[in-house]
Structure formats: structure tokens, C-alpha cells
Regions:
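Glycoside hydrolase catalytic-domain context in secreted enzymes
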Residues: 1-194
Length: 194
């Protein structure tokens, strides 16, 4: 399993992926390699997201939440799924369905906002667009993140860094942050990232 970070373009991804798969096929067990990607279809220069380059460019998930159209989110995910499959990416390290309840957290734009019910509806559509009704040869598996919710990070600091791990659930609202994850599980997300 590889997480593909920054690349100069789709043609480079395809060449690299094909060489990597050829190498894997020539090993004793011949187990294929899985290529994963963080979101790369948004027009953004955030350090948490990949530049779109040759991929289609869409608004951030927070923008999609502002529109509030579940079918638009499903169409977006289906379109991006086709792009991922074309270059060999089979795991999407998204959707990020944390609830944006800590305004200092720098990853809010990658969420569907602070409304748990809206996030749950849009996450379900997102997963359906990438995975289809069931995982199959044309699916891209979603790894929904960050359970149990990265949105309430203490002082807005990101938990990817060991110097500050901790979440705050003011008003004892931990269960509220679980609502989108319950919906993702019901939608049969392929995986969940802590």
C-alpha cells in the first residue's frame, strides 16, 4: 500500500504505477500494490491537500456543504473516481467527515462543516460515488477519516504531530461527532482512519 503524494502530472502517475505493479508481479508472491491518495481534485494550496494538476478541479468539501446538494456530491465523487481508476489509484484517503467545531483547526475546508446531519448525508453520497453500490473492479475504496472526529482538536492543533494530541468535546458532545461516522459505516465505507 502506497500513499501517492505530490506528482507532476497524470502521465507520470501512470508510468510510475505501471512500473511499480510490474515490480510487484515479478516478486515471489506477485501480490499487486495498492495506490492510495489524499484528495487531489480541489483547487487549493493547503498543505493538507494535493494540487489537482491534470485532475479535474472542484470546490472544497466545505463549499459542497454550503451548496448542500447530495446528488452533486455523488456526481463529483463518481467523476473523480473515474480519474483515479484511469491512473491506477484504488484507495481514496477521504472523505474527511470530521465536524468543524474548533474554528482554529486548519483542516476545516476539507470537511462538510459542523452540521452532523448534513455531513452524514453528504458523506453517504460521497462514498456511493467512489465505491458504487458494492466494491468492484471500477470502484475506488474510501478510507473515511478521522474517527472519532478530528474537528474538535484542542487549540486547533493537528493530531498528526506528536507534540499535541488531544480532542475537546465541549458540552459533552462526543456522540454528536459520531453521527457522520455511523452514516459512513451504514454506507459501507471500505475503511476508517483514526
Amino acid at each position: 500500500h502506497f500513499n501517492l503524494w505530490d506528482v507532476p502530472g497524470a502521465a507520470v502517475v501512470v508510468r510510475w504505477y505501471n512500473r511499480l505493479q510490474q515490480f510487484a508481479e515479478e516478486t515471489r508472491l506477485g501480490i499487486p500494490v495498492t495506490i492510495a491518495s489524499d484528495p487531489r481534485s480541489h483547487f487549493s494550496r493547503s498543505i493538507y491537500e494535493m494540487q489537482a494538476r491534470d485532475f479535474s478541479q472542484w470546490c472544497q468539501p466545505l463549499g459542497m456543504a454550503a451548496i448542500g446538494d447530495k446528488e452533486l456530491v455523488r456526481q463529483f465523487a463518481d467523476f473523480v473516481r473515474q480519474e483515479y481508476v484511469a491512473v491506477g489509484m484504488r484507495v481514496a484517503l477521504h472523505p474527511q467527515i470530521d465536524l468543524a467545531t474548533e474554528p482554529r483547526w486548519p483542516r476545516i475546508n476539507g470537511t462538510f462543516g459542523e452540521d452532523a446531519a448534513l455531513s452524514a448525508r453528504l458523506a453517504t453520497a460521497y462514498i456511493a460515488g467512489f465505491q458504487g453500490e458494492a466494491l468492484g473492479p471500477e470502484s475506488v475504496a474510501c478510507m473515511t477519516k478521522h474517527y472519532p472526529g478530528g474537528g474538535p482538536q484542542k487549540e486547533g492543533l493537528d493530531p498528526h504531530f506528536s507534540f499535541h494530541l488531544g480532542q475537546v468535546y465541549p458540552g459533552d458532545n462526543f456522540d454528536y461527532h459520531l453521527i457522520p461516522f455511523k452514516a459512513a459505516i451504514e454506507a459501507k465505507t471500505a475503511a476508517i482512519m483514526p
